[in-house]
Amino acid sequence: MNLSYTPATICAVATAPGRGGVGVIRVSGKDLLPFAQAISGGKTPKPRYATYTDFFDAHGQALDNGLLLFFPGPNSFTGEDVIELQGHGGPVVLKMLLARCVELGARLAEPGEFTKRAFLNDKLDLAQAESVADLIDASSETAARSALKSLKGAFSREVHGLVDELINLRMLVEATLDFPEEEIDFLKQADAIGRLRRLRAQLVGVQATAKQGAILREGMHVVLVGQPNVGKSSLMNALAGDDIAIVTDIAGTTRDTVREEIVIDGVPVHIIDTAGLRDTDDVVEKIGIERTWQAVERADLALLLVDSREGLTAEVQSILERLPPALPRVQVFNKVDLSGEAAGLAEQDGHPLVRLSARTHDGVDILKAKLLEMIGYSGADEGVFLARQRHLDAIARAADHLELAEADWEQVEIFAEELRMAQNALSEITGEFSADDLLGVIFSRFCIGK
């Protein structure tokens, strides 16, 4: 990268807050061998080997003991000299070691600054850098494996392959601009439009994989709504496989929203159980009902629960009418164990209808499968990498530019410009074409020490 940064020495605790057996201080900067010698009492650590040593303060008194590792740049995570101090994991000990690092000239690192330096020093591209945070934040094994694929460059290789094809096609198209009277014949002979169509097909494949990766990262927010005592809390417990919410036969037991994250086939699903919807004079219950509608506004999908013995009553119809028209929903007819109906999937008024029993779990797997289908998840295979919404936006813009390029290919200057814009959009993913403010936003969301 050609973006500049101040080459100050930075330091941070790289392990999680709290007490533990081991705590790690990470330091990055230029020419850190004297730094390592000062904190270890004059020892010269062998690069990429663990050196057992005491860690000393400015007066020669030991603060802690443990392992010192020295990674000379550029063969390090950040591309600079990197030191790791692996001591005991107590907060007080780590605070003393961090203060000693500051005494030796380091400053406290900003969130994500180590990874940002790795990006700026061409150790990682931007998609790989983001996957560091995604791997840390992964809420399922599938998401973690996909994030690791991105960190190892699976997503970046796909993008670089598309960009390379675009560059070659641009070179061909722009070379014809000097020969306007022959440019169309030249492009036809070179099969420019055929190459463009193949490129668009490749992009569609990458886009589909990226969408699956984005679902693994973002998951979906599902709100449970319905009248009191229709089994919303029981269904939440059935989906979670645990007793998350209190369940009684008393209508109105749930008076506030209860949130739980579960994992369905590797996809994080944020379930929100809500207060039952009914007319009430109870002040507390009214507040809970208002929060129910607030949760509905923020949800990706609604599960409208109905007592299968009663069906779509006038009260249920009023709830249906208030749901946002654009909000996807599934009508869940619960308590089939009491109504005598069979669990299964159907459709009503253009929306899915699932019959189940939250108490016996009969039909719950049908609902889980339907949720994944509605969010567009087809299952993670070995090739799925994790992606973010900004990646999907960039791919969509590139696809739009390639569509325009094909439509206007006989106007060669427009053809060339649309190819350039498509290349720029894709290059935003890996960071070859990114604004400083975008980088600031991305790395500010990392934890300190990464």
Curated annotation (Swiss-Prot):
It comes from Chromobacterium violaceum (strain ATCC 12472 / DSM 30191 / JCM 1249 / CCUG 213 / NBRC 12614 / NCIMB 9131 / NCTC 9757 / MK). This is tRNA modification GTPase MnmE. PROSITE patterns: G_TRME (PS51709). Exhibits a very high intrinsic GTPase hydrolysis rate. Involved in the addition of a carboxymethylaminomethyl (cmnm) group at the wobble position (U34) of certain tRNAs, forming tRNA-cmnm(5)s(2)U34. One of its GO terms (cellular component) is cytosol. Residues 219-376 form the TrmE-type G domain. It is an enzyme of class 3 (hydrolase). The keyword Magnesium applies. InterPro entries: G_TrmE, GTP-bd, GTP-bd_TrmE_N, GTPase_MnmE, MnmE_dom2, MnmE_helical, P-loop_NTPase, Small_GTP-bd. GO terms for biological process: tRNA methylation; tRNA wobble uridine modification.
